[in-house]
Amino acid sequence: MANLRSALVFLLQSIVVGLAVAFLVVLIRPDLMPGIAAQDDRPASYADAVDLSAASVVNIYTKRLVQDSDAPNARTRFRVDTSFASAVIIDPAGYLVTNYHVVFDATEIRVQLSDGRITEPDIIGVDAETDLALLKVDLGSLRAIRLGKSSQLRIGDVVLAIGNPYGLTTSVTQGIVSATGRGLLNLVTFENFIQTDAAINAGNSGGALINSLGELVGINTAVLAQDAGTEGIGFAIPVDLARGVVEQIKQNGRVIRGYMGLVPDDLTNAERTALGIESNAGILLVEVYEDGPAAAADLRRGDVILEMNGEPVFSQRQALLISASTVPGDEVEVTGIREGARFTALVTAGERPEEPR
């Protein structure tokens, strides 16, 4: 009995000593407890990020004439439709970025700043192919948002959407980055969207998608929902793309893009196997315009393109983005397969027409 009592006392003493040592280790060397340290590092609030950026998100009110098919006579066949949207101040000089669809066909546009001032902006330029528009207001030096880098976003990063949903000014919703580089949505010509589960509602269009540091990483543009009872999936235009569009509009009044005069399509697995292509790279040229740069470089319908400027090409969308990222006069080295043999061609980019074929 005495031996059992001694054993229990020894066991309890060991447990107490072990807990005491563990407690001291956590106090002295918290870096040795990564799980606990990681929890301590998480922000309890994103209020600081909102404070840094919310004043740079403005409200937009537009009016446009809309044809009313139910009008009883010709005099009342049109009605005035009022819409709410958002824009982001990206330059203290008064430059604002919003969506092209926000200002398209608007008969009146008004901007309301976070301090309540209201003015009519000038439209500096638009780019329908990325759904972006650059506006400017003359209200002195304004508080511009800090630009982040959308290329550094990772799936799972926390993001906040700031906008004017349903006319409710400076509303903030939280979510994560669900995906990057989203395409095939048939929303615009050049799709490279950030997908997020942050709520993006009517009026959020043109608003800011920010990271946890309060930096702009995207321009909110669209939400997809299966039906009225389904929570939608939000999409934003990456700030890296928006930055390039803005600079071109500032310099040229429009966006000037390269053009190769070809129509690519994705390869199926069966086509890739038949051609002996072991990697996932490769797109099929289904059309090469006779008077285009690709035809001048002897590219032909039926060619399979593997690389453009040394970069493996995996999809139609990627090929279009590479082509559009050039400027007229740039040379694009193309590597491909024709009738089982590899070839290389040098395409001199032309200027993409406003309504490309």
What is the predicted role of each segment?
Residues 308-313:
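Short strand-turn-strand beta-turns centered on an Asx-Gly dipeptide
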Residues 305:
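Short alpha-helical segments in extracytoplasmic peptidoglycan/chitin-binding modules
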